[in-house]
Amino acid sequence: MLAVASQREKRQPERSYLIGMYRHLDDEKIIETLQRLRGRIVERFPGSSLSKVSEELLTVAREAASHVQYLASPSWPIRASVGLAILVMLAGVGAAVFRIRLIPGSGGWPELVQGVEAAINDVVFIGIAIFFLLTIETRMKRRRALRALHQLRSIAHVVDMHQLTKDPEQLLSNPPSTASSPVRTMSKGELGRYLDYCSEMLSVTSKIAALYVERFDDPVTLSAVNEIESLTAGLSRKIWQKITMLNV
C-alpha cells in the first residue's frame, strides 16, 4: 500500500506538468514545427519561392520568441521613472492643498471656494497625467507587438499570393493556355502537396500571432491577433477547397 501511494505521489507532479504543457503555447515547439515544415518544402520544392517564404516565416517566429519574452517581463526602468514622476506630482498636490488657508477679514469663504475649485482642477489634470504615465509601459509593448503582427499579416498575404495561380481545375481539365497564362509544371500530387504546405504555413502563422497575447493582456493586441486568425482561417479555407477539388 505504501509503495502504491508513493508511486501515485510521484506521478502526480508529472501529470500536473503534462496538463500545464497543453494549456499554453510553447514558442520552441512552434519553431520546431516550422523548421520541419521548411525542411519538407525545401526537399519537395527546392529553390522555390515558397521555400524562401518559409525561411522568412521561421525568422519571424524566432523574433517572436524574443518579443514574447519582452512583453511578459516588467520594464523596471520605466516603472521606476513613472513611480518617481507620480510621487513628485502627488507631493505638488499636497503642497498646494496645504497652502489653502482661511484668512479672516480677507474674503474668507469666497477665497476658500476658489482655492478648492483650483485644487479640484489640479487633481483632475494630475489624475489624467497619472493614467497616462501608468499606461506608458503597456503602450510601448503594444506598439512593438502590433508592428510584429503587421509582419505576420503581410506574410499571410504573401502565402496566399503563392497559391493564387495554383488552380486544380486547369490541371484536371487541361484547357488551352494563352500568352499570359502562368506556367504550370506540377503534377496532381505535387500541386496537392504545395497547397497543403501553404495551408500549414497559414496555420503556423496564426499560432505565432497567438504567442503575442499568451502572457500579454492587452485588448488592442488581442483584437489584432483575432484579425490575423480570422484572415489565415479564411485563406486556408480557400486552399482546402482547391485540395478537395484535386481529391474528387
Model feature map: region roles:
Residues 22-29, 37-65:
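Short, charged cytosolic
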Residues 26, 30, 53, 119, ...:
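Amphipathic alpha-helix face/heptad-repeat signature
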Residues 66-140:
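Alpha-helical transmembrane segments and their immediate juxtamembrane boundary regions
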Residues 205-248:
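Cytosol-/stroma-facing membrane-proximal "stalk/adaptor" domains immediately downstream
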